[in-house]
């Protein structure tokens, strides 16, 4: 099998790869547009002279204030990810998305009331509420997409979540360049970027009213008829089609196995997480993936991009904003390639390994240049020398390695590697761990740059090297594996051969199942499907 082949667990009718699955993923991914925009715009907005003048920036401890404004958002997101578990369990994925959008909308609206007379209090409070909203969304959105996605393109569809993140990021990075170029320094100049947060939240509120509920959640809650009806609509197939019969059978078998082993109640997954070593082990793996993701330095760059580029030698407000905007565009373009091709063809594991290796080399080079040339000491307006241009090149090359690997892939893996009855709790833990590591990195990044200088780049480069060892020995490939077979996948050893072993077994079982169906007369297997098998 080619390393770039699209992996199907069984012959899949073309109707399954239809516009409906992409539409549902796109609507749900307005969640990530909120996250991407918020993470991108805040650092550059804080660097606008109009914002600093209105809040008398020079009289404040700017490192502390910047860190607080950024990190309160992550603190809210940590708790939002946990609060989303009962919402997703009892009310469903669709209403969970609605909840996240409403809370974010409220927080974004609160920030618009801030000004020099009122101080930063409304921004602090709004950041916490917005964080709760995006934390809840970061839990529910990947689950929703993975539960309705066909296995062969599940990575691509969950990747739409990441694409939304990058689209929001591009707008967030460029909007401050736009207002800085076109508007005089004023309250209006810096409040516009805050107001734009309302747009993706409003679109998600409208979209959540129109999309279908997750069929797997409907099965989990005992609403079998509605689950079959919804699944048939999403797959664009009649309920008695052989592909549908197989999928319904797999869902119900998985739920029955989990009912026997764990139970289906609200508290059962908590008990399973602490008593079932397999689940606890995968929770550990999911949390560690987000440690390594944040350990790459991405959020230090996202939230404090003007300072990052200044450390390389990029000076001048507009120049820094422009360089930051280009960084956002590079990420978005590469994410599009990752989404359309790499995640489901090259695979999750291979992307993580290659991205960590290449990204680490780039950060060592950038840090080495800063250590030798000390560009942060250059006078304002100094042109980049050849070394500085090379450092910028390797920074963008780091972006090219990081974006299609560690940026979205941990979200894909966490959304798919747990059984249905613990998936909501597991994703809550995974999302919360992401925001915890995100908080720790973003809270102390300003102090790290002040005290460590070039050492910050060496620190992140070293963590990327360690992530290679972690992935190689502990993370199996998951592309094309049905959600109901993930426990079997993680049981197989060695890890680097687990995927090929499982796919071979699944195809053998599928052939036997279809042969039995044909012999019993319960389902027709067309010649086309037999030949594909």
UniProtKB/Swiss-Prot annotation:
Its main location: membrane. Residues 1-21, 89-94, 149-156, 213-282, 347-349, 407-431, 476-533 are cytoplasmic. It is a multi-pass membrane protein. It comes from the Eukaryota. It is found in: Cell membrane. Ubiquitinated. Deubiquitinated by creB, probably to control its activity or amount. GO terms for biological process: carbohydrate transport; quinate metabolic process. Belongs to the major facilitator superfamily. Sugar transporter (TC 2.A.1.1) family. Integral membrane transporter that imports quinic acid to be catabolized as a carbon source. This is Quinate permease. The gene is qutD.
């Amino acid at each position: 099998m080619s390393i770039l082949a699209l992996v199907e667990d069984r012959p899949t009718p073309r109707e399954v790869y239809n516009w409906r699955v992409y539409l549902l993923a796109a609507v749900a991914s307005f969640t990530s547009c909120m996250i991407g925009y918020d993470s991108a715009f805040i650092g550059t907005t804080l660097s606008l002279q109009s914002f600093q003048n209105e809040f008398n920036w020079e009289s404040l401890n700017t490192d502390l204030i910047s860190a607080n404004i950024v990190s309160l958002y992550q603190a809210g997101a940590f708790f939002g990810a946990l609060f989303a578990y009962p919402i997703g369990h009892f009310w469903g994925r669709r209403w969970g998305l609605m909840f996240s959008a409403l809370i974010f909308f409220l927080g974004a609206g609160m920030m618009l009331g801030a000004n020099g007379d009122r101080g930063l209090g409304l921004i602090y409070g709004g950041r916490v509420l917005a964080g709760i909203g995006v934390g809840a969304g970061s839990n529910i959105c990947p689950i929703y997409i993975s539960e309705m996605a066909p296995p062969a393109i599940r990575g691509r569809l969950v990747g739409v979540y990441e694409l939304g993140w990058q689209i929001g990021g591009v707008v967030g990075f460029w909007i401050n360049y736009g207002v800085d170029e076109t508007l005089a320094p004023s309250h209006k100049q810096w409040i516009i970027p805050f107001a734009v947060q309302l747009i993706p939240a409003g679109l998600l509120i409208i979209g959540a009213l129109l999309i279908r509920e997750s069929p797997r959640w409907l099965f989990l809650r005992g609403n079998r008829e509605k689950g079959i009806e919804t699944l048939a609509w999403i797959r664009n197939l009649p309920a008695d089609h052989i592909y549908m019969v197989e999928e319904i059978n797999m869902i119900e078998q998985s739920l029955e196995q989990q009912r026997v082993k764990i139970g289906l109640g609200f508290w059962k997954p908590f008990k399973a997480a602490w008593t079932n070593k397999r689940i606890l082990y995968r929770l550990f793996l999911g949390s560690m993936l987000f440690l390594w993701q944040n350990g790459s330095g991405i959020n230090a760059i996202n939230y404090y991009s003007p300072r990052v580029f200044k450390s390389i030698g990029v000076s001048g407000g507009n120049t820094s904003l422009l360089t930051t905007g280009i960084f956002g565009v590079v990420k978005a373009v590469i994410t599009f390639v990752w989404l359309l091709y790499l995640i489901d063809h090259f695979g999750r594991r291979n992307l993580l390994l290659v991205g960590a290796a290449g990204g680490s080399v780039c950060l060592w080079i950038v840090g080495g240049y800063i250590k030798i040339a000390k560009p942060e000491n250059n006078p304002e307006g100094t042109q980049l020398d050849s070394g500085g241009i090379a450092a910028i090149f390797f920074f963008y090359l780091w972006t090219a390695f990081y974006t299609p690997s560690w940026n979205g892939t941990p979200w894909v893996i966490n959304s798919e590697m747990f059984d249905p009855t613990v998936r909501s709790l597991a994703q809550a833990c995974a999302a919360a761990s992401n925001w915890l590591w995100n908080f720790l990195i973003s809270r102390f990044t300003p102090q790290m740059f002040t005290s460590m200088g070039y050492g910050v780049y060496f620190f992140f480069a070293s963590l990327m090297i360690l992530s290679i060892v972690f992935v190689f020995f502990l993370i199996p490939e998951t592309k094309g594996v049905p959600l109901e077979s993930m426990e079997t996948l993680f049981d197989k050893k060695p890890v680097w051969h687990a995927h090929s072993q499982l796919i071979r077994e699944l195809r053998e079982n599928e052939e036997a199942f279809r042969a039995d169906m044909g012999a019993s007369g319960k389902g027709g297997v067309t010649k086309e499907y037999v030949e594909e098998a």
